[in-house]
């Protein structure tokens, strides 16, 4: 049995390389799918034939699968190395291309949302596994704009909020944190610092926590402006243009949750805040503290007396999955064996 080691993930199962012909072929193939799909526009009438309807759905499904593969590669590459100019360039190119493809195929979802309820139900009743997807699409009808407006928003998002998030990741992932450990100053990534934030040493927890926010505070005005930009964009689109009842309503609909359900959850959480407060008091007692500090929220209540290397930790995890369900363990093991875990510290 091979030993599991801390390694970056392999993306070879998506594409062999970032600059190989396979990626360019994927762009060409998806572009052709989008162009071919436009032929369905003239078939989308109130009296559409069921076979034509299912052909259109399967064409959307095939294009969506291809788009996910093409979009996942640069997304994972960028997530693993946010400072790579090549990763950023490909990521931006794919996002722009996806907006173009979405705009070419947008007419299908707009037509489907506008179709009369009786006709839509007749088609959904025969659509088997596609029914939930079709129903969900129609729930967005009251908040859908014209085709021209939706196209503008797709383009706006690429160069607006998506670009802001990419910029935020690029800025914050270059941060280096410095903490004194055992009398020696060490440089750490955020992931490494988080171990100290959640560690058993109260002084190290405090030092790590303060260092985390010291570094972020240096860029506070910049990060704050980016956050405000995203908030304004969300409100302008979802309240002013799409007419949602509240900013959270747009997210609730995406999550297939009625506003009333989320409101009840929030209301009950507020009314029972004392449960959370009692938990903090009890944890402070377990830690031997008069009052829980901000640095102690994630502190373990007992010191760990064992350490495990990565290989041992993986095998313990797989063993637990095996006890739960052998099939789950098999799938989890495949993720590790295929190099789909990005475990390298950096």
Question: Positions of the model-derived regions?
Answer:
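Long, charged, glycine-rich C-terminal linkers/tails
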Residues: 294-297, 328-346
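A well-structured
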Residues: 1-320, 324
């Amino acid at each position: 049995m091979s030993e599991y080691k801390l390694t970056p993930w392999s993306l070879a199962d998506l594409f062999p390389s970032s600059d190989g012909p396979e990626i360019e072929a994927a762009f060409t193939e998806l572009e052709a799918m989008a162009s071919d799909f436009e032929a369905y526009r003239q078939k989308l009438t109130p009296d559409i034939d069921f076979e034509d309807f299912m052909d259109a759905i399967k064409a959307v499904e095939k294009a969506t699968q291809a788009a996910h593969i093409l979009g996942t590669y640069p997304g994972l590459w960028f997530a693993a190395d946010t400072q790579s100019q090549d990763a950023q360039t490909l990521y931006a190119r794919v996002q722009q291309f996806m907006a173009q493809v979405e705009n070419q195929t947008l007419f299908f979802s707009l037509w489907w949302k506008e179709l009369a309820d009786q006709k839509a139900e007749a088609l959904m009743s025969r659509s088997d596994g596609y029914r939930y997807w079709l129903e969900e699409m129609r729930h967005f009808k009251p908040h859908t704009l014209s085709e021209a407006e939706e196209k503008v928003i797709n383009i706006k998002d690429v160069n607006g909020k998506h670009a802001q998030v990419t910029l935020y990741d690029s800025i914050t992932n270059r941060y280096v944190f410095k903490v004194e450990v055992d009398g020696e100053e060490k440089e750490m990534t955020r992931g490494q610092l988080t171990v100290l934030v959640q560690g058993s040493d109260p002084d190290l927890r405090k030092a790590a926590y303060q260092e985390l926010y010291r570094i972020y505070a240096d860029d506070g005005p910049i990060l704050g402006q980016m956050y405000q930009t995203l908030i304004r964009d969300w409100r302008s689109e979802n309240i002013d243009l799409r007419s949602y009842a509240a900013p959270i309503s747009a997210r609730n609909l995406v999550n297939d949750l009625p506003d009333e359900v989320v409101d009840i959850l929030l209301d009950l959480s507020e009314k029972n805040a004392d449960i959370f407060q009692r938990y903090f008091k009890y944890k402070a007692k377990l830690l031997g503290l008069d009052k829980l500090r901000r640095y102690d929220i994630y502190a373990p209540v007992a010191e760990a007396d064992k350490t495990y290397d990565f290989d041992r930790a993986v095998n313990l995890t797989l063993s637990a999955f095996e006890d739960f369900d052998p099939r789950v363990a098999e799938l989890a093991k495949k993720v590790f064996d295929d190099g789909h875990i990005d475990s390298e510290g950096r």
